[in-house]
Design a protein with these regions (language model features):
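Flexible, glycine/charged-enriched surface loops at secondary-structure junctions
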Residues: 16-20, 55-62
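Short, low-order "capping/linker" segments at domain edges
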Residues: 69-76
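Flexible glycine-/small-residue-rich
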Residues: 21, 30-32, 65-67
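A short interface-forming secondary-structure element
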Residues: 26-41
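Short, non-transmembrane amphipathic alpha-helical segments
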Residues: 4, 39-59
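Short acidic amphipathic segments
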Residues: 8, 14-17
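Residue-level signature of catalytic and energy-coupling elements of molecular machines
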Residues: 8, 28, 63
Length: 76
């Protein structure tokens, strides 16, 4: 599972990666500043392709890229 996270973190714009469900799913947090929607989709495809090329595993690995912006203001 660490190898899944390590491969995902190699891509530009990726802030964090977490393997869940015994390595059947990888959730990738993309930087909203570095990756727009199109870049996030490309990162997702590229990570999945890297897994296919570099790893041997039974079944499938689902790759989910999450890109969000949060804004917070306090009214006093």
């Amino acid at each position: 599972m660490e190898e899944l996270e390590t491969i995902a973190k190699e891509f530009g714009g990726v802030r964090a990666a977490f393997a869940v469900q015994a390595g059947r799913e990888v959730r990738v947090i993309a930087s909203a500043k570095e990756a727009d929607d199109n870049v996030a989709a490309k990162i997702c495809r590229d990570i999945a392709a890297a897994y296919q090329e570099r790893l041997s595993y039974p079944g499938e690995i689902k790759v989910v890229v999450i890109r969000e912006s949060r804004f917070t203001e306090l009214a006093k």
